Amino acid sequence: MRTLWIMAVLQVGVEGHLMQFETLIMKVAGRSGVWYYGSYGCFCGAGGQGRPQDASDRCCFVHDCCYGKVNGCDPKKDFYTYSEENGAIVCGGDDPCKKEICECDKDAAICFRDNKDTYDNKYWFFPAKNCQEESEPC
């Protein structure tokens, strides 16, 4: 499943908000979301189950929970509006639902930046069979 997400993002002409998320991660965390988080731990990438393996994986868990609370638009496809002001990402636009998506993505990008030191290559392409513990609630 995670591989499908990576492939979807890497295809030429990809549209929708996943590319915006990648851009935010690059701007805020200074690294590629697709490369570093496209298939990391139990929650980064498509799907998610079990318990987060470290703080970086927890960023993805919280992001998944945030998306789960968005109603009225599609977090994986809809474009949102944001700007940069004094080095900070500011979510904008008239659509409150799309603004929520932006806030979810912004918070995840900040989380990735703040937890770079927890990133552990042993969780890159982590086997789903190691993510069988009961998930905690959002």
Curated annotation (Swiss-Prot):
Belongs to the phospholipase A2 family. Group II subfamily. D49 sub-subfamily. SMART domains: PA2c. Binds 1 Ca(2+) ion. GO terms for molecular function: calcium ion binding; calcium-dependent phospholipase A2 activity; phospholipid binding; toxin activity. CDD domains: PLA2c. It is found in: Secreted. Ca(2+) binds at residues 43, 45, 47, 64. Snake venom phospholipase A2 (PLA2) that shows a moderate inhibition of ADP-induced human platelet aggregation when tested on platelet rich plasma. Exhibits high hydrolytic activities and prefers the anionic micelles (dPPC with deoxycholate) to the zwitterionic micelles (dPPC with Triton X-100). PLA2 catalyzes the calcium-dependent hydrolysis of the 2-acyl groups in 3-sn-phosphoglycerides. It catalyses: a 1,2-diacyl-sn-glycero-3-phosphocholine + H2O = a 1-acyl-sn-glycero-3-phosphocholine + a fatty acid + H(+). Keywords: Calcium, Disulfide bond, Hemostasis impairing toxin, Hydrolase, Lipid degradation, Lipid metabolism, Metal-binding, Platelet aggregation inhibiting toxin, Secreted, Signal, Toxin. It is an enzyme of class 3 (hydrolase). Residues 1-16 form the signal peptide. Its EC number is 3.1.1.4. The keyword Calcium applies. Its cofactor is Ca(2+). GO terms for cellular component: extracellular region. Disulfide bonds join 42-131, 44-60, 59-111, 65-138, 66-104, 73-97, 91-102. It comes from Trimeresurus stejnegeri. This is Acidic phospholipase A2 Ts-A1. InterPro entries: PLipase_A2 (IPR001211), PLipase_A2_Asp_AS (IPR033112), PLipase_A2_dom (IPR016090), PLipase_A2_dom_sf (IPR036444), PLipase_A2_His_AS (IPR033113). Expressed by the venom gland. The active site is at 63, 105. One of its GO terms (biological process) is negative regulation of T cell proliferation. The keyword Hydrolase applies.
